[in-house]
Amino acid sequence: MYNVKIENTGRYVPDNIVTNEDISKIVDTNDKWIRERTGIKERRISKGENTSHMAIKSAKDVLRKSSIKADELDLIIVATCTPDCFVPSTACIVQDAIGATKATCFDINAACTGFMYALSVASQFIKSGQSKNALVIGAETLSKMINWQDRGTCVLFADGAGAAILTRSEEVGLISQYTCSDGTGGKFLKCDALPVENPYVSEKTEFLNKLSMEGREVFKFAVNAMIDSVHKVLEKTDYTIEDIDYIVPHQANIRIIEYVAKKLKVSQDKFYINLHRYGNTSGASIPIALDEMNEKNMLKKGDKIILVGFGGGLTFGAHLIQWN
């Protein structure tokens, strides 16, 4: 078995900044209401760029900083629940755009936990020897699945992409991982795809292709799932929460993060938070945050970092990584 590390990171967000004041012109809300309930001040919303466009730009960003070239990649995984199309996969579109001709490519849909799942899968490919260099991307255009008349969701979600290159390493980079799902709660966060319509269907089914969310149920699930994931990922090691330098949570809601910090008995200063600027970008939120930290030179060799997320499905999970 080989060791795996994150070799570098990248990100891309649309230029279009939508403030809470802008949202208040669309639905009955205001800046104070949004900030107090979510912690969000502004978010990035696409003016036409689709998921693959943002995924490609985040891929080019990480490749620009990496010592690994596109033709050295042998695996590309894109985590998204908002692909451009059913076929081809977003990963294949990225492959074509960056010239990664030797890569196996596929998408993963675990909603906001997608990047956690993709990291887990990519690391297993590398550990087993099947791959050496993997590009993992979380990319979402949530603005196209939002009901812009529903203030409970349209104030939260946004667009963006984050990327990381994983590579075989002599040093341990990905220390432990934990992923889990609870399909019984799938109805709490949902967006339909296409209805079954063909000459043999006699009755039309109810169909809603916009995101719906039961906020209270998602909150209860989220805080418990994140706390459980942190405990589970630490249980597999000799480390305790005191050994952790940073926690990078899914950037969903400041109240969730505050509650988790309190229950873990950890200072909120240990949590990297940027949701006030980007909103909830689903599977892109953790890699965007990680790249910001990397760009700011916050991460030092040997730092222990927990990445932890939750999302529709319901899905949840965490990774304990050591920065190399």
Swiss-Prot record:
<dbReference type="Pfam" id="PF08545">
    <property type="entry name" value="ACP_syn_III"/>
</dbReference>
<feature type="region of interest" description="ACP-binding">
    <location>
        <begin position="251"/>
        <end position="255"/>
    </location>
</feature>
<comment type="function">
    <text>Catalyzes the condensation reaction of fatty acid synthesis by the addition to an acyl acceptor of two carbons from malonyl-ACP. Catalyzes the first condensation reaction which initiates fatty acid synthesis and may therefore play a role in governing the total rate of fatty acid production. Possesses both acetoacetyl-ACP synthase and acetyl transacylase activities. Its substrate specificity determines the biosynthesis of branched-chain and/or straight-chain of fatty acids.</text>
</comment>
<dbReference type="GO" id="GO:0006633">
    <property type="term" value="P:fatty acid biosynthetic process"/>
</dbReference>
<keyword id="KW-0511">Multifunctional enzyme</keyword>
<keyword id="KW-0012">Acyltransferase</keyword>
<protein>
    <recommendedName>
        <fullName>Beta-ketoacyl-[acyl-carrier-protein] synthase III</fullName>
        <ecNumber>2.3.1.180</ecNumber>
    </recommendedName>
</protein>
<dbReference type="GO" id="GO:0044550">
    <property type="term" value="P:secondary metabolite biosynthetic process"/>
</dbReference>
<keyword id="KW-0276">Fatty acid metabolism</keyword>
<dbReference type="Pfam" id="PF08541">
    <property type="entry name" value="ACP_syn_III_C"/>
</dbReference>
<keyword id="KW-0963">Cytoplasm</keyword>
<feature type="active site">
    <location>
        <position position="112"/>
    </location>
</feature>
<keyword id="KW-0443">Lipid metabolism</keyword>
<keyword id="KW-0275">Fatty acid biosynthesis</keyword>
<comment type="pathway">
    <text>Lipid metabolism; fatty acid biosynthesis.</text>
</comment>
<dbReference type="InterPro" id="IPR013747">
    <property type="entry name" value="ACP_syn_III_C"/>
</dbReference>
<feature type="active site">
    <location>
        <position position="250"/>
    </location>
</feature>
<keyword id="KW-0444">Lipid biosynthesis</keyword>
<keyword id="KW-0808">Transferase</keyword>
<dbReference type="GO" id="GO:0005737">
    <property type="term" value="C:cytoplasm"/>
</dbReference>
<dbReference type="InterPro" id="IPR004655">
    <property type="entry name" value="FabH"/>
</dbReference>
<dbReference type="InterPro" id="IPR013751">
    <property type="entry name" value="ACP_syn_III_N"/>
</dbReference>
<dbReference type="InterPro" id="IPR016039">
    <property type="entry name" value="Thiolase-like"/>
</dbReference>
<comment type="subunit">
    <text>Homodimer.</text>
</comment>
<dbReference type="GO" id="GO:0004315">
    <property type="term" value="F:3-oxoacyl-[acyl-carrier-protein] synthase activity"/>
</dbReference>
<comment type="similarity">
    <text>Belongs to the thiolase-like superfamily. FabH family.</text>
</comment>
<dbReference type="GO" id="GO:0033818">
    <property type="term" value="F:beta-ketoacyl-acyl-carrier-protein synthase III activity"/>
</dbReference>
<feature type="active site">
    <location>
        <position position="280"/>
    </location>
</feature>
